């Protein structure tokens, strides 16, 4: 697409939107300005291509399409069938998976589809066979009650939150924690690395239905072959949530034992983050679970979002291009440059570095909480997010860590030299930030003190760093 075409498309769109609700158009313009001027280091964020973004803004939004390709509950879905089939084809080819389901609206929806597919395969189907019933509607009230009780009495083993796991992996505040009896595995307290022997021991003791791999804040590769062996040893279904690192799998930065697709029974992902697509989810699996996953609607989902599936098809097609392999490699190289730069300047990193797209800074060495550090960095034009670290003394709200990631800045074209310079900016801000005090004189976990001159200086340096790497350079909104 030419630059003139992109600018014309977005100017026209904002003109149409602004004629109805100018405040929305102004917010869209302001968001582009903010993203252009900030060092975006949130590991779960990226920049989708103009083609991907434009694919979401069309009349597919008007169409209901409950069901699956060729088997809809509504007439007139032939064009939705086209884009869903294309998105699924690209996902299968990109990841080397026998089956792909691209309807989930988000990562948690993808996880819920996977959870219930496993429950349907492992618990519901045997119960139907025992009752000589073809469908749950054919069960007696007594059999249905017994099945519901059995479905709600299953176990899941996943990574603990403070070790880098995700809320949707069976933790009580999330619906997954109300579905499963969950137990966590953690990391070695000295190295911060996954303790695979500890995982095996926990699996033997707990005997989970699902062993769940994947993370949102673990800065190292995971050996999925070992986890599959552990799952097999206790008869568990091995599930992997690769939402954070799917782009590294697609781009062949993770291969062999570190590629989850050949090893897991079922894999879930988002389509944004390192995949650089629209906000959405997908599920990959083999033929043994495909029929159950294909029942995502009505099992978990209602109508899909056809406009987002169209954008998924575009983004997944982009990820199949040869240059995406280079992109994935540069994400990792940039993350390692950022981590090395931080450590050379005295920052403490969980696990002492990174193998993937993110690093986790222990900010207690600066005398700060994660919340204080996050806001001080934001004041200085550096966007991060606070994150718990293993055995975090400040809990999940204030935290003791800052998570930084490189997918977005890599998309903009920054390289290892710029990421080393970014490490200097981060260190400067954190070194000049101090805890604030509460009204009663006690030390605050939220308030902080940062000289505005330091924030302004670093903010200008961050802006200068980005000058040579414009975001959406072809788009001029005037």
UniProtKB/Swiss-Prot annotation:
The record marks 272 as: Plays an important role in substrate specificity. Its main location: cytoplasm. It holds the Pfam family SHMT. It is found in: Cytoplasm. Its cofactor is pyridoxal 5'-phosphate. InterPro entries: PyrdxlP-dep_Trfase, PyrdxlP-dep_Trfase_major, PyrdxlP-dep_Trfase_small, Ser_HO-MeTrfase, Ser_HO-MeTrfase-like, Ser_HO-MeTrfase_PLP_BS, SHMT-like_dom. Its EC number is 2.1.2.1. GO terms for molecular function: glycine hydroxymethyltransferase activity; pyridoxal phosphate binding. It catalyses: (6R)-5,10-methylene-5,6,7,8-tetrahydrofolate + glycine + H2O = (6S)-5,6,7,8-tetrahydrofolate + L-serine. GO terms for cellular component: cytosol. (6S)-5,6,7,8-tetrahydrofolate binds at residues 161, 165-167, 291. Pathway: One-carbon metabolism; tetrahydrofolate interconversion; Amino-acid biosynthesis; glycine biosynthesis; glycine from L-serine: step 1/1. The modification N6-(pyridoxal phosphate)lysine is found at residue 273. Keywords: Amino-acid biosynthesis, Cytoplasm, One-carbon metabolism, Pyridoxal phosphate, Transferase. GO terms for biological process: glycine biosynthetic process from serine; tetrahydrofolate interconversion. NCBIfam families: PRK00011.1, PRK13580.1. Belongs to the SHMT family. Homodimer. Catalyzes the reversible interconversion of serine and glycine with tetrahydrofolate (THF) serving as the one-carbon carrier. This reaction serves as the major source of one-carbon groups required for the biosynthesis of purines, thymidylate, methionine, and other important biomolecules. Also exhibits THF-independent aldolase activity toward beta-hydroxyamino acids, producing glycine and aldehydes, via a retro-aldol mechanism. This is Serine hydroxymethyltransferase. It comes from Salinispora tropica (strain ATCC BAA-916 / DSM 44818 / JCM 13857 / NBRC 105044 / CNB-440).
């Amino acid at each position: 697409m030419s630059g003139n075409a992109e600018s014309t498309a977005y100017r026209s769109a904002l003109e149409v939107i602004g004629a109805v609700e100018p405040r929305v158009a102004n917010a869209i313009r302001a968001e582009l300005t903010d993203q252009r001027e900030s060092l975006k280091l949130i590991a779960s964020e990226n920049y989708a291509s103009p083609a991907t973004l434009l694919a979401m803004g069309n009349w597919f939004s008007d169409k209901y399409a409950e069901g699956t390709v060729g088997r809809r509950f509504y007439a007139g879905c032939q064009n939705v069938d086209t884009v869903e089939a294309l998105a699924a084809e690209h996902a299968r080819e990109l990841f080397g998976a026998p089956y792909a389901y691209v309807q989930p609206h988000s990562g948690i929806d993808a996880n819920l589809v996977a959870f219930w597919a496993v429950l349907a395969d492992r618990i519901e189907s045997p119960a139907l066979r025992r009752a000589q019933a073809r469908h749950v509607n054919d069960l007696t009230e007594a059999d249905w009650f017994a099945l519901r009780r059995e479905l709600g009495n299953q176990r899941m083993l996943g990574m603990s939150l403070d070790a880098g796991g995700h809320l949707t992996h069976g933790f009580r505040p999330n619906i997954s924690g109300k579905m499963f009896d969950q137990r966590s595995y953690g990391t070695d307290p000295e190295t911060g690395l996954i303790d695979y022997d500890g995982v095996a021991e926990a699996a033997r003791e707990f005997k989970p239905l699902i062993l769940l791999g994947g993370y949102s804040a673990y800065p190292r590769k995971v050996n999925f072959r070992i986890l599959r062996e552990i799952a097999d040893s206790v008869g568990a279904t091995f599930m992997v949530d690769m939402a954070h690192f799917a782009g590294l799998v697609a781009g062949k930065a993770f291969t062999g034992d570190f590629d989850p697709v050949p090893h897991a029974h079922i894999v879930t992902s988002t389509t944004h983050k390192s995949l650089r697509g629209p906000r959405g989810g997908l599920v990959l699996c083999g033929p043994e679970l495909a029929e159950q996953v294909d029942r995502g609607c009505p099992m978990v989902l209602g109508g899909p979002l056809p406009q987002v599936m169209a954008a998924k098809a575009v983004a997944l097609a982009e990820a199949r291009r040869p240059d995406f392999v280079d992109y994935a490699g540069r994400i990792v190289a940039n993350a390692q440059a950022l981590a090395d730069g931080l450590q050379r300047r005295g920052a403490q990193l969980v696990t002492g570095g990174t193998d993937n797209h993110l690093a986790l800074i222990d900010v207690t060495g600066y005398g700060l909480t994660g919340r204080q550090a996050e806001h001080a960095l934001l004041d200085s034009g550096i966007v991060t997010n606070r994150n718990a670290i293993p055995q975090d003394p400040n809990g999940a709200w204030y935290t003791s860590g800052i998570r930084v990631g490189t997918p977005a800045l890599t998309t903009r074209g920054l390289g290892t030299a710029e990421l080393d310079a970014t490490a200097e900016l981060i260190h400067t801000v954190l070194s000049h930030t101090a805890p604030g005090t509460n009204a009663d004189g006690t030390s605050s976990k939220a308030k902080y003190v940062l000289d505005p001159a330091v924030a302004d200086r670093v903010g200008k340096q961050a802006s200068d760093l980005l000058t040579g790497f414009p975001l959406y350079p072809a788009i001029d909104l005037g």
